[in-house]
């Protein structure tokens, strides 16, 4: 009996270890000495996966702002840091910081959309372009977009998500209400032949397209990420502020402006006490690979934000609704 049990463990152990190793857990330690990576966005560029993510000031320096880290992978699991993008390197040295990247591959180049950071209500969406995915040149017209102040927005724009739908580009962004208390989603549009510069974008709706409603969404909807299935757009979004806990929801639309939640409950919850993501599962990015498979990248931690890791899970679809492969 003992010999049979030993043989069984010997056979299964390599597969168990392989399964454990296949769980992506990425944390960039270059800035503050501990894993600290947020706001992931992934593209397939020239056959290699590139992940862009937010990194904090070096050693929490008060004179240096947030930046964007760059990592590459061939399997979406194992990632190597290959560089970083800063306000100085991109050509916007007057900005206090930059973070929350969104990347788009067009005609052999990577277009990076990111937010200025550190200016409160004046934070806005910016744009830069790269030929190699690592070295970027900023748009001379930066910032390219922020909404005008109105009864629903203070004029701030962060967490850009840019996508093309029905011949137009949609720029999804998070903004605060005039009291700077509630975070909610807005959207701007541009023509299909846009160069993404300032002046190209028009706010598409004079109210939030998605605002917090359910208890789990708290006072915040942010971090929108878009994918397509059939004639529908799906938005994966973060509900509630960081570590409240933040969790992930899904909404659906046929026009990119009017959205309906798929459920009153989170699609991806924070982990149970003791698990790596017990403080949150947040700021999603839904990556669609060239073969059509979809993966949910998101950030998490279990120490109220002292560290931040990025992971991913494959998303499967049935009857127009997504579900996690790990939970099937």
Where are the regions that the model predicts?
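Peripheral membrane lipid-binding modules
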Residues: 100
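C-terminal transmembrane module of eukaryotic multi-pass membrane proteins
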Residues: 283-284, 298
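Beta-rich carbohydrate-recognition and catalytic domains
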Residues: 20-96, 104-155, 163-219, 227-277, ...
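Bacterial Sec-dependent N-terminal signal peptides
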Residues: 1-21
């Amino acid at each position: 009996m003992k010999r049979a049990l030993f043989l069984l463990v010997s056979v299964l152990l390599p597969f168990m270890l392989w399964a454990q190793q296949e769980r992506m857990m990425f944390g960039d330690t270059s800035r503050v000495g501990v894993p600290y990576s947020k706001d992931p966005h992934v593209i397939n560029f020239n056959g290699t996966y590139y992940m862009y993510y937010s990194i904090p000031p070096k050693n929490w320096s008060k004179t240096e702002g947030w930046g964007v880290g760059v990592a590459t992978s061939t399997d979406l699991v194992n990632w190597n840091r290959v560089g970083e993008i800063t306000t100085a390197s991109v050509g916007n040295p007057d900005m206090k910081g930059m973070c929350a990247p969104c990347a788009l591959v067009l005609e052999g180049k990577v277009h990076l959309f990111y937010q200025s950071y550190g200016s409160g209500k004046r934070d806005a969406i910016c744009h830069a372009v790269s030929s190699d995915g690592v070295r970027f040149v900023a748009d001379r017209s930066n910032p390219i977009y922020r909404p005008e102040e109105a009864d629903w927005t203070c004029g701030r724009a962060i967490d850009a998500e840019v996508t093309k739908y029905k011949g137009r580009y949609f720029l999804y962004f998070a903004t605060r209400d005039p009291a700077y208390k509630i975070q909610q989603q807005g959207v701007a549009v541009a023509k299909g032949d846009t160069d993404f510069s300032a002046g190209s974008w028009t706010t598409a709706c004079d109210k939030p397209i998605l605002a917090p409603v359910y208890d789990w969404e708290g006072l915040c909807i942010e971090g929108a990420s878009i994918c397509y299935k059939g004639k529908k757009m799906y938005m994966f979004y973060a509900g509630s502020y960081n570590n409240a806990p933040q969790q992930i929801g899904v909404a659906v639309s046929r026009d990119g402006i009017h959205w309906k939640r798929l459920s009153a409950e989170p699609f991806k919850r924070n982990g149970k006490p003791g698990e790596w993501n017990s403080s949150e599962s947040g700021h999603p990015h839904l990556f669609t690979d060239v073969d059509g498979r979809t993966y949910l990248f998101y950030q998490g931690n279990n120490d109220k934000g002292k560290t931040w890791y990025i992971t991913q899970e494959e998303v499967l679809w049935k009857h127009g609704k997504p579900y996690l492969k790990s939970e099937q």
